[in-house]
């Protein structure tokens, strides 16, 4: 049977996305127990290979593996032979020789997980590749959204922030539109990818134009580590024009929810009052991330494609 990977959502059918989400439901029940561990992946080894800094995603994958009783080996770029000039290809061969059963890769170069998947005969999970994709984040966002809004068809969801540099935005757009979500994007023109409207989304320059009737708002941070100079006048001006505050949130439906993939820059893209408000489901996203990643590990290592 061919090795199954999770490299991106751009070409993934809705049925396959749904398979991950459905398998996350029993995983969430497991992590709600006092004793969270089950023996499902006992004897399996998961290697997390992170060439970029990460707190939430790395911890989420580690916990997902541990709750399923898999062993984990955590490798950061600073502690690996990459600092000595070792290529990803050679690292891949080493991982394969050591007997890993699955590799989770985060890398600054778009396409790196695809390259790794061609080199080794074990499942590869893309934990973020450059500005390209972050599929498990989109899966957990979709899972959270369905918990709060079971009928996604026609739901208006507004994404506000640095769309240009966001792999989260790309994966979410591909996933959400497959389930009939009406996706609207808000960003300064300099922070929008060229031709983004061709992805079946509606683009706005001002939050005030997009937020009315929205049932969900997803806020993205300014990725200043990836930006070139001059894309925005300054951070304060951006916060004034695009930050999600209580006044802007009031334009949405009374039951609208607020999402953020983290890390948050409070007072810039999102106000304290909104991030800590009753409509925010940000902590739900974190919890659901573990359940979704448990489902991913299970399906890729033990599950079978219909």
UniProtKB/Swiss-Prot annotation:
Q: Tell me a Gene Ontology molecular-function term this record carries.
A: amino acid binding
Give an example GO biological process.
amino acid metabolic process
Which InterPro entries has this protein been placed in?
A: Asp/Orn_carbamoyltranf_P-bd, Asp/Orn_carbamoylTrfase, Asp/Orn_carbamoylTrfase_sf, Asp_carbamoyltransf, Asp_carbamoyltransf_Asp/Orn-bd
Instruction: Please give the family membership noted in the entry.
Output: Belongs to the aspartate/ornithine carbamoyltransferase superfamily. ATCase family.
Keyword field contains Transferase: yes
The UniProt catalytic activity note for this protein reads:
carbamoyl phosphate + L-aspartate = N-carbamoyl-L-aspartate + phosphate + H(+)
Give the record's keywords alphabetically: Pyrimidine biosynthesis, Transferase
Q: What class of enzyme is it?
A: transferase
Subunit structure, interactors included: Heterododecamer (2C3:3R2) of six catalytic PyrB chains organized as two trimers (C3), and six regulatory PyrI chains organized as three dimers (R2).
Gene encoding this polypeptide?
A: pyrB
TM segments? none
Q: Gene3D superfamilies from the xrefs?
A: Aspartate/ornithine carbamoyltransferase
Q: Where does L-aspartate bind?
A: 84, 167, 221
User: In which residues is carbamoyl phosphate bound?
Assistant: 56-57, 106, 134, 137, 262-263
- Write down the Pfam families for this protein, in alphabetical order: OTCace, OTCace_N
Q: What does this protein do?
A: Catalyzes the condensation of carbamoyl phosphate and aspartate to form carbamoyl aspartate and inorganic phosphate, the committed step in the de novo pyrimidine nucleotide biosynthesis pathway.
Q: Which domain of life is it from?
A: Bacteria
Q: What is this protein called?
A: Aspartate carbamoyltransferase catalytic subunit
């Amino acid at each position: 049977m061919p090795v199954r990977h999770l490299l991106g959502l751009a070409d993934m059918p809705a049925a396959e996305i749904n398979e991950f989400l459905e398998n996350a439901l029993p995983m969430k029940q497991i992590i709600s127990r006092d004793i969270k561990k089950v023996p499902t992946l006992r004897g399996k080894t998961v290697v997390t290979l992170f060439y970029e800094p990460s707190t939430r995603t790395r911890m989420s994958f580690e916990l997902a593996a541990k709750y399923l009783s898999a062993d984990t080996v955590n490798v950061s770029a600073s502690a690996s032979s990459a600092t000595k000039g070792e290529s990803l290809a050679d690292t891949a061969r080493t991982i394969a020789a050591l007997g890993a059963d699955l590799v989770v890769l985060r890398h600054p170069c778009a396409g790196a997980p695809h390259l790794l998947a061609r080199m080794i005969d074990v499942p590869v999970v893309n934990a973020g590749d450059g500005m390209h994709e972050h599929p498990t984040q989109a899966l957990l966002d979709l899972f959270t959204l369905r918990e709060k809004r079971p009928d996604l068809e026609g739901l208006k969801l507004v994404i506000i922030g640095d769309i240009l540099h966001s792999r989260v935005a790309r994966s979410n757009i591909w996933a959400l539109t497959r389930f009939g979500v009406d996706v609207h994007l808000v960003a300064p023109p300099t922070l929008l990818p060229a031709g983004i409207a061709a992805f079946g989304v509606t683009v706005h320059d001002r939050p005030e134009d997009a937020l009315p009737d929205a049932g969900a708002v997803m806020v993205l941070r300014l990725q200043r580590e990836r930006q070139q100079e001059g894309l925005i006048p300054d951070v304060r001006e951006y916060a004034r024009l695009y930050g999600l505050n209580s006044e802007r949130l009031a334009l949405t439906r009374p039951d609208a929810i607020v999402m953020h993939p983290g890390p948050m820059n409070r007072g810039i893209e999102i106000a304290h009052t909104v991030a800590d408000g009753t409509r925010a489901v940000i902590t739900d996203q974190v919890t659901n991330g573990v359940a979704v990643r448990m489902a991913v590990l299970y399906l890729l290592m033990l599950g079978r494609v219909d």
